[in-house]
Every structure is written in C-alpha cells, then in structure tokens.
Amino acid sequence: MAHQAHSYHMVDPSPWPIFGAITALLTTSGLIMWFHYNSIALLTAGLLSMLLVMIQWWRDVVRESTFQGHHTPTVQKGLRYGMILFITSEAFFFLGFFWAFFHSSLAPTPELGGQWPPTGIKPLNPLEVPLLNTAILLASGVTVTWAHHSITEGNRKQAIHALTLTILLGFYFTALQAMEYHEASFSIADSVYGSTFFVATGFHGLHVIIGSSFLTICLLRLIKFHFTSNHHFGFEAAAWYWHFVDIIWLFLYMSMYWWGS
C-alpha cells in the first residue's frame, strides 16, 4: 500500500450509491402501487432491498472509520458540513409542506366551505395523543443529550442506558402515531386538509423511523466499543438529526394540530 501524505480519505469504488438509488426507485414505485392498486408486493421488495443496502453500506463506513482509521479530523470536518447541509435540505423539504398547509388554510376556497378545517372534517384533539407525542419527543431529546454527555465523559454504561431509552421513546412515538392514523375520522383523500395533514405528519413519522434506526446502529456500535470520548461523529450526526426531528414536530404540532384544528 502506497504511503498517504495527506489527511483526506480517498474512497474506494462502492456499489452502494447506485444500489441505494435503485432501491429508492423500487420503494417509491411500490408506494404508488400501494396507493393506487392496494398491492404491497413492490413496496415490500423495495423496503427489504433498501434494508440490505443500508446494512452493507453502514458496515463499510464502520470499517473505514473504526478499523482502518480513515476518518481523520479533516474527514470528520467534511462529514459535519455534509450532515449540516443534509439537515438544511430536509428543513426546506418540510417548508414545502408547511407552505401548502398555510396556503390552503389561511384563505379557504369555496370548495372547502370557506372555512378551516373544511366542512365535514373532524380534526384530532391536540390535547390528547398529539400532546403525549410532543412530551415523548421532548423527553427523547433530553435522553439523547444525556447519552451524548455520557459518551464525551467516557461513561459508557450510562450512555447505553440513555440511548436505549431514546430508541424506546422513538418507537413508542411511532406506535402512537400509527394508532392515531388508524383512529382518525378522515383520510389522505379527504380534501386538501387530509392531504397536507397526512403527507406532512407521515413524512415526519418516516423521519422518526429513520432516526430511530440511526440511533439503534449507534447503540450497537456503542456496545461494541466503537466510540471514544473524542471520536464519535456517527452518534453526533444521529443526535443532530434527532433534534431536527424534534423541532419539526413542534412546528407540526403548533400549526397542524393546535392552530389548524
């Protein structure tokens, strides 16, 4: 192996980006098939293949960072910029949903009965399950910060406890959201209210599942001694993402659940 006289990571050719793109196409096509033809075969194939790509891509990144030492301070700086830009792009993604919601609700058209919520829509009570979900996500924000401080202080046992608690709260939120969807008196097909509500809260729910998965990988790595007090960017990125999910939920709760009802 040739001597490397710089601190940059020269990445080896990887099949995962193109395979990841193919599984994303399969999953989104499967979603369309499910919505229009009530068939989940393609969606299941897409999700399973995406899971396989995720596991193998994560394995490669873990090997490059933990075992080969490619994630030097210079590389970590680049990864931090990348994560910040990714979260910024996600913020603009949600901005589009909020824009659609306020565009429709601030000046309701005659088709909606000139009112918001539209005629015939019975909105969810913001002081019931949505308020509990808000408390759960805020509590998970506290526990993930507790885990972060425990890692930086070298207290591995406490970090494992805090991170496990965060993941359990994340899955509890997802279960409550699924229950709320099941019991809602309106659907995604019920006017622009149903469309904006389910698309915005559904995409947020998807982000909670992604964040919970990200934190689960971090927990497994923490158990296997992959993180040190000064080298744990994988966890840091997951924590940033989780705080972003928390903040988006607060905006969703205040606008769609509380003000929108």
Swiss-Prot record:
Cell membrane is among the record's keywords: no
PANTHER family from the UniProt entry: CYTOCHROME C OXIDASE SUBUNIT 3, CYTOCHROME C OXIDASE SUBUNIT III
Transmembrane parts of this sequence: 16-34, 41-66, 73-105, 129-152, 156-183, 191-223, 233-256
Subcellular location: Mitochondrion inner membrane
Mitochondrial intermembrane-side segments: 35-40, 106-128, 184-190, 257-261
EC number: 7.1.1.9
Gene that specifies this protein: MT-CO3
Source organism of this protein record: Coturnix japonica (Japanese quail)
SUBUNIT field: Component of the cytochrome c oxidase (complex IV, CIV), a multisubunit enzyme composed of 14 subunits. The complex is composed of a catalytic core of 3 subunits MT-CO1, MT-CO2 and MT-CO3, encoded in the mitochondrial DNA, and 11 supernumerary subunits COX4I, COX5A, COX5B, COX6A, COX6B, COX6C, COX7A, COX7B, COX7C, COX8 and NDUFA4, which are encoded in the nuclear genome.
UniProt protein name: Cytochrome c oxidase subunit 3
InterPro entries: Cyt_c/ubiquinol_Oxase_su3 (IPR024791), Cyt_c_oxase_su3_dom (IPR033945), Cyt_c_oxidase-like_su3 (IPR000298), Cyt_c_oxidase_su3-like_sf (IPR035973), Cyt_c_oxidase_su3_a-hlx (IPR013833)
Keywords of this entry: Membrane, Mitochondrion, Mitochondrion inner membrane, Translocase, Transmembrane, Transmembrane helix
GO cellular component: mitochondrial inner membrane; respiratory chain complex IV
An example Gene Ontology biological process: mitochondrial electron transport, cytochrome c to oxygen
